[in-house]
Amino acid sequence: MAGKVPTPHIGAQYGEVADRVIMAGDPLRAKFMAENFLENPVQYNNVRGMLGYTGTYKGKRVSVQGHGMGIPSIGIYTYELFNFYDVKRIIRCGSAGAFHPDLKLGDVVFGMGSCTDSNYGAQFNLPGTFAPIADFELLRAAANKAEELGIGYKVGNILASDVFYGDDAESWKQWQKMGVLAVEMEATALYMNAARAGKSALCICTISDSLVHGTACSAEERQTSFTNMMKIAFDII
């Protein structure tokens, strides 16, 4: 179902967005990807400062788009892309905080599944609990590409949390006990919107801080230095 464009959040006309989109929470990271990976990028969106560009990468038409922070924000952008712009696949390139002691700053994590403390799924009125998971073909391609490029990675469950500054500073350890690798704030909505629309999605994260070791990347590093996951995303999209 294509239509209802431009939307309140994306200023593009139908056809200006490619059917393959790589997303980032920070719109400046989207701009960085457009300037460093795309040939002949054309900006199609600056509504609310959430930058979007379309260009080509190795002969493929690809768009990059910011989505903001949190499940409600990515929920809006991915819904509109999947349902109004007829996007077929979305890969999120994001940052995450490590729960696993072996994960170091800059390591790459592929979110095979997305746990959450959000009630985003309640809207679907399901008679049970839905398990939001990545598209297997994208996940397999990402792992294979990481092997090919010699990039270290882990695959497993991640947590999409509604809370950045939690009142209980130790609650993450309960997720750690269940083998959850890392925390971010968006993958559940991405995966559920993809499932509902019959489309494909994958969340790739770079570790920007560690709750285990108390280390963190700078804001500048978060914006520009996560190139390994970007290489993977562009090669498999």
Q: Where in the sequence are the language-model features?
A:
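Active-site rim beta-loop-alpha module in soluble metabolic enzymes
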Residues: 129-178
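A C-terminal functional module that forms or caps the active site or interfaces directly
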Residues: 169-208
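Expand to "…catalyze enediolate/carbanion chemistry for C-C bond making/breaking, isomerization
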Residues: 83, 167, 196, 204, ...
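Glycine-rich beta-alpha junction loops
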Residues: 27, 97, 159-164, 189, ...
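Generic non-transmembrane alpha-helical segments
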Residues: 141-149, 193, 232-236
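His/Asp/Glu-rich mid-to-C-terminal helical/loop segments that flank catalytic regions of hydrolases
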Residues: 211-237
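Metabolite-binding pocket within alpha/beta catalytic cores that recognizes anionic/polar moieties
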Residues: 1-140
